[in-house]
C-alpha cells in the first residue's frame, strides 16, 4: 500500500469490504485502526460509501477511474449476512457465524425466501438479469475488439518494443552471459550477490530489485548502480 501511494499508481483501484466482522469476533474487539486515515496518509484517494448501495458503488468507481494522481481505496461499509435469516427466521445479520460457515437447514430456506428467491429453484436467472448480461457481453466484445486493434497499431508503429514485450511475457528465461560476472576469492556473500545483481541489471531490462532501506548494507545497490531507481 505504501509503495503504491508513493509511486502514485492511479490505475490501481482496491475495494475494502468493511463489515466489522471476522471469523471469531467482531473487529472492534481486536483493533481500533482507522483504515481510511491510514491509506490517506499513504497518499491514497479514499472513498467511503454504503457498500450495499449499487448506485454508490457505481459513483465511487467512476470517481476512482477519474483520479489521475493516486491509487484509490473504496471502503464499503457493508452488512455481514445482509438479508440472512436463522432457523427461527430471526435476523442472521452482523453474525460471526456467517463468516466461515454456510447457511444450513431452515436458515438457508428462510434466507432465500426473505431475499425473494425460490429455495426449490435457487439458481434461476431472472429475465431482466439475462437481458442486462447479454447487453453487457455485446458491449465488452466491442471494447475488446477496439483494444485488439489499438494493440496491433501500436505493435506496427513500435516493432522493437512489441518484440521485447512479447519476449518478456513468453515465459522464456532471459539470456544472461554468466561469464560477465567477476568474483573475488573469499569475498563476502553479499558482495558476491552484488556482482551478480549488477550483471543482471545490465542484461535483464525487465528485472526489478527491491530492498527495504538496506541496499547499502545487503549490497542490493549492486543492482541500482547499474540501472536507476524506480520512482514516480
Where are each of the predicted segments found?
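Thiamine diphosphate
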Residues: 131, 135-232
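Glycine-rich ThDP/TPP pyrophosphate-binding loop and its adjacent helix/strand module
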Residues: 1-134
Amino acid at each position: 500500500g505504501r509503495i503504491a501511494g508513493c509511486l502514485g499508481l492511479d490505475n490501481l483501484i482496491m475495494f475494502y469490504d468493511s463489515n466489522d466482522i471476522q471469523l471469531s469476533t467482531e473487529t472492534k474487539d481486536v483493533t481500533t485502526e482507522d483504515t481510511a486515515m491510514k491509506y490517506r496518509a499513504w497518499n491514497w484517494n479514499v472513498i467511503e460509501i454504503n457498500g450495499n448501495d449499487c448506485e454508490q458503488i457505481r459513483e465511487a468507481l467512476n470517481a476512482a477511474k477519474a483520479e489521475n494522481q493516486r491509487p484509490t481505496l473504496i471502503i464499503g461499509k457493508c452488512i455481514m449476512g445482509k438479508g440472512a435469516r436463522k432457523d427461527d427466521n430471526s435476523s442472521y445479520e452482523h453474525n460471526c457465524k456467517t463468516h466461515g460457515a454456510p447457511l444450513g437447514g431452515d436458515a438457508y430456506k428462510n434466507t432465500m425466501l426473505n431475499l425473494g428467491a425460490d429455495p426449490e429453484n435457487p439458481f434461476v436467472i431472472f429475465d431482466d438479469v439475462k437481458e442486462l448480461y447479454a447487453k453487457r457481453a455485446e458491449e465488452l466484445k466491442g471494447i475488446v475488439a477496439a483494444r485488439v486493434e489499438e494493440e496491433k497499431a501500436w505493435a506496427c508503429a513500435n516493432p522493437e518494443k512489441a518484440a521485447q514485450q512479447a519476449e518478456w511475457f513468453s515465459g522464456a528465461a532471459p539470456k544472461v552471459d554468466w561469464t560477465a560476472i567477476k568474483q573475488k576469492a573469499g569475498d563476502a556473500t553479499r558482495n558476491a550477490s552484488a556482482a551478480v545483481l549488477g550483471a543482471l541489471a545490465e542484461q535483464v531490462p525487465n528485472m526489478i530489485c527491491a530492498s527495504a532501506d538496506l541496499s547499502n548494507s545487503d549490497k542490493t545497490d549492486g543492482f541500482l548502480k547499474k540501472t536507476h531507481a524506480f520512482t514516480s
